[in-house]
């Protein structure tokens, strides 16, 4: 068995399968997607999995929470001895720097969580005894993933820690603080963690910077920016939570965020408005083209059908109309729903 294992939001398997198929074809690697709706993962079967993984960077994949290279598929595992067949399948492999035992984030996968936890504790010492796992986590070495699809069915896969999600299941465990104005704050928190590298965050999100938040009410995204000590112009006809205004970093303008433009360029423009995705893509492109912002993070609400087609169309429309040299990344975040979050920054 050779291929890529990618986790996704339950119900978005067709979109991830279409994305992997399109991207593999673009780089000239043949393969096919194996999945069923609501599995919470897609297995892209191909002979050149390592080469494909190197060409498809994790941050560039839209619908994939995690990207792994499959090295074995084990079926019919004896529940009384799962360790022996795993050690046999790993014979000849290099030493791994860490072990994550996982399951898909799906209705069928979640009942396997307790098995994953307990089996990980049993497997670690066996791997170390066999010389297959370092004594302590070594992030510079490949990471071993065991993904249980059922009690007797598992996929063994490898991750490059520099090109994969740094969280089990590809899900960042963010806590909604009591003072957050809305749950949407988690979207921007996750976007900053996922779409930007640590070095990019340090360089591009600094105290004293200026931002515009379009469609800001009740202030979730504005609040996230103020916690980074960024000055925010929050544009919305609706009210902001009082404690957001009390930071002293926020100017609230009662206006239509879709048509407002700043008097001076800002470092960041963020937008989480409920609007047709193509209209949003066009308006965001105008902001970039006119030089009203240097960088932007915005959400595109996807239709119920043809979501991959709409995603491609909107991103192509944005890049064509922006008329700038940009680095564009998009993700369906864990805290997103029927939407994707897009980052565009000056190249």
UniProtKB/Swiss-Prot annotation:
List, from the UniProt record, the residues annotated as the active site of this protein: 301
**EC number per UniProt:** 2.1.1.186
Q: Does the keyword Ion transport apply?
A: no
InterPro entries hit by this protein: RlmM_FDX (IPR040739), RlmM_THUMP-like (IPR048646), RNA_MeTrfase_FtsJ_dom (IPR002877), rRNA_MeTrfase_M (IPR011224), SAM-dependent_MTases_sf (IPR029063)
Keyword terms? Cytoplasm, Methyltransferase, rRNA processing, S-adenosyl-L-methionine, Transferase
Under the subunit heading, UniProt states: Monomer.
Task: State the family named in the UniProt similarity comment for this chain.
Answer: Belongs to the class I-like SAM-binding methyltransferase superfamily. RNA methyltransferase RlmE family. RlmM subfamily.
Q: What is this protein called?
A: Ribosomal RNA large subunit methyltransferase M
From the UniProt record, report the name of the gene that encodes this protein: rlmM
